[in-house]
Every structure is written in C-alpha cells, then in structure tokens.
Curated annotation (Swiss-Prot):
Reaction(s) catalysed by this chain's protein: 5-O-(1-carboxyvinyl)-3-phosphoshikimate = chorismate + phosphate
Top-rank taxon, per record: Bacteria
Cofactor: FMNH2
Organism, scientific name: Salmonella typhi
Role, per record: This reaction introduces a second double bond into the aromatic ring system.
GO cellular component, one term: cytosol
Subunit organization: Homotetramer.
Pathway given in the UniProt record: Metabolic intermediate biosynthesis; chorismate biosynthesis; chorismate from D-erythrose 4-phosphate and phosphoenolpyruvate: step 7/7
Alphabetical keyword list: Amino-acid biosynthesis, Aromatic amino acid biosynthesis, FAD, Flavoprotein, FMN, Lyase, NADP
Name of this chain's protein: Chorismate synthase
Amino acid sequence: MAGNTIGQLFRVTTFGESHGLALGGIVDGVPPGIPLTEADLQHDLDRRRPGTSRYTTQRREPDQVKILSGVFDGVTTGTSIGLLIENTDQRSQDYSAIKDVFRPGHADYTYEQKYGLRDYRGGGRSSARETAMRVAAGAIAKKYLAEKFGIEIRGCLTQMGDIPLEIKDWRQVELNPFFCPDADKLDALDELMRALKKEGDSIGAKVTVMASGVPAGLGEPVFDRLDADIAHALMSINAVKGVEIGEGFNVVALRGSQNRDEITAQGFQSNHAGGILGGISSGQHIVAHMALKPTSSITVPGRTINRMGEEVEMITKGRHDPCVGIRAVPIAEAMLAIVLMDHLLRHRAQNADVKTEIPRW
C-alpha cells in the first residue's frame, strides 16, 4: 500500500489502523538541536482527541504519544523521530454486523475493490483515527516554525451546516468545544448538534486554517506550487471534499479589478490570493478553507449491498461524530504546518543565498 508518506525534505510517514494495537509515525528531516519533549506534542493531540466533548465521538482514547527515537537529552538529533500512540478503547464488536456489508458513503466498497479485502473494524486504515499521528508530526513542525521563524498557524470552524461563523475573535476558538471564533453562534451550534443526535443524523462543515509570518518565496513551481501542495495535504484528510485558497470559488463572481491584490509602498492592499501568487508565498497571511462532508456513520437506515451483491438495509452502530469538522481543526493546522516546514527547508536548500532589493512587509 503506497501513499503513506508526505513531504520531500520534511517527510512524515504514518502507519496503523483504527482498531489495531497502535498508530505510528516516522518523521524525517527535523533539524538537530531543537528542544522537543512528548509534552510539546500532547497539547495538539488533546485538542483532536476523541471523547472530550458531548458533541464528538465518545470513544475515549488518551492518545498519549511516545517518542521512540530521534531525541536525546531533550533535543532532536537530526535522525528519524519515531512516534507511537497506543489504541486503548476499541470496541470491535460494534462492527461485526458490517463484516460482509458495505457502509454507504464509506471507503468499505472501494478498499475491497482495490485490495480484495478490508479491515471492517472502524474502517481500518481509512479511519480518521490515523490523523492522530499527523497531528503529532504537525506539532513538531509548528514548534519549529514558531520558534525559528515566528510563523503562527491557527484554524477554526467557519461554517456548520447552514450556520456561517465569522472570525470575530481568535481567542474564542480555544474557549469552546466547536473551535468557533464567533461566540454569538454557540447556542445555535449547540441546538443543531442536539437535534442531529436526536435524529441520528450528521452535518457537514467548513474549516479555515491560516498561517501568519510566512516569508515570501516559499513554493516550487510548477508542479510543487505552495498552494498545490497545501491543497494536496488538506484533501488527504478524511471527509474533505473541497479546498479553497484565499477567495477560492468566490473569485468566479469577481472582476479582475476587484480580485487583484494591489500593491502600494505600504504593502498589499488586500489578500484575495490567500498569501500565494504564482505558487509562491507573498509574505501575506496564507489562508485556506476546506469543506468536510457529513459523516455517513449515522443511525438513519440506508440502502446498500453485501458481498453477494444483495440489497440490504443497514444502520451504522458504534461511536461517531455528528460533525467531523469540529475535530478537523487541529488536523488542518498540522497538515499546513507539515507543508510549510517542508517548503521552508526546500527553499533554504536552494535559495539561501538569494538577495533582493524588493520591499517586504
């Protein structure tokens, strides 16, 4: 099975399944001499961790990460960093009824078509449980980017269902279980989630992730444009069905005179491009959005087929998120951090000696 690694100089490889013994990861390309402890990774893992809110799955995993290699006396050695998170709260019996049935909207059918078999326990490798290791690896990148370059990465929920959420106050994001920046909408979100749980249904969401302090010049045209790699990374997250950079699809309704980010002696006058021009960072905030589908793990009866091709009706049992977009916020932050760190290392490797007289803001 290919496709388990992302990055070129900063490379992250993950392994493990939802109901396996553990999740693991190998992080290559971390420079030596960076102070790093398990506590540095645990904060973001706790933000993603299941069972911490009545609005998310009640699978209770401590997600305690162990650093197995690549760190000595509290600092990175420059060698591969091995990471491990044990699975401790599996209920594989919840999935025995779907052993021979393909859940509609899930990867069951396509995994079996590709591999001829599948781990039906919680989706196996296709489960979003895998993203815990991405968050751990992303925390390493976030720490390096922040401490060495002053780059800050943060994300929030900007829409749930038909409820838009304006970015009014970033401080609010960590003060509520929705990662919501609009305190005025918390009651509406609570009401929606309660209704979904009662109905046994789910809802989609939009997550926005932003990076500030990114220097101009990151990105490798033409196939490894910065926005292309960000889109690739975000699209690799479970349930993501669309990615926008900057204004995204809103540019369809704009004119060139409205959309172009004009430049004065004081700097850029707008940021419709989301901080990336020609696939290269402009020095402005990098802004990306991703749309997450409503999970198909619901108790509303649905039609599907079994291995024999017979039509059956099924209800998904187990513990699931009514809105997977909530816990996707730290995952999006991690993936953006991984891409930015990889591109920063690549830029320094080729262009460290480049000097220009062009203003930077």
